[in-house]
Amino acid sequence: MFARHLRSGFRFQASLIFLVLLATNLPAVSPARSEDKKRDTPAGPVTQGQRVFSCGHSFHVFVPGILSDMAKAAGIEDHQALGLSAIGGSRVIQHWDVSDDKNKAKEALRSGNVDVLTLSPIHLPDEGIEKFAKLALEHNPNIRITVQEFWLPFDIYDTTFKLRPQTVDHNAPTAEELRKLHEPYFQNMDDHVRSLNKLLGKEALFVVPAGQAVIALREKIIAGQAPGLSTQQDLFTDAIGHARPPLQALVAYCHFAVIYRRSPVGLPLPAVLARANNPNWDEKLNRLLQELAWDAAVHHPLSGVAAGAKP
């Protein structure tokens, strides 16, 4: 049922994604990000445009086009979105299992011309992450693989996908409740990424802490400190939690921060917000989204961004 709901949401997103891609010429701290945890070795800012291939479901597929827009605005002219494998409600293994004659992700990785592979599992374990990582490193030892956290569908943590609430009130949970709810999910992802890096013998996989940035934004909304957003529901199109433009922008900023290891703070209003025809989604909101994304990346020990890095 979850996959069916997400496929429905994916169709809803498809037209918006197409417009964004066309327009961009596409060719509060949770326990899981605690400062007390060991931080993996970060590197400095990435100055060269990255060639990015993405695989994901509808909580991720909007990222490539928006990221291209942001990179261009940041003066990164040689950023390239190489392709997108989009499957509604998918686990990473489903992208791996696409037949070789149609598998654009494998084709791109085998060329050795991919700098960053972005993945977005639903829940773990997901053997597709390891399979893609090994193939990617075989053809480009310097590739980085990012694994995107998400915000829990239906605001519940259920790896069986059997629990389906009759109604979902996204405005109901407090920030503390959201952090507690997401804690095992975040911990599971961090443990999985660390174990894969150990298996691979290098830090090749990095976490994009989008889920934690979303909690921080929801906390700001609850406190009345999010310009242009009155309720938590303003972030979502439906009960599952498909993203409206402000949430899409936040997630893309998280990817920008992790991929380029530099702050998005100060970038102009992205097309995804500018073309939404909502005057409340302005530069003040944009600045907040940038700050939250950067803060999440800086404080996550697996993002690859140096702790204490300045905006």
Spans of model-derived segments:
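Bacterial N-terminal signal peptides
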Residues: Q13-P27
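N-terminal low-complexity, Pro/Thr/Ser-rich intrinsically disordered segments
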Residues: E35-Q50
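Conserved SGNH/GDSL esterase-like catalytic core that processes O-acyl groups on lipids
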Residues: Q50-C55, F59-N142, H299
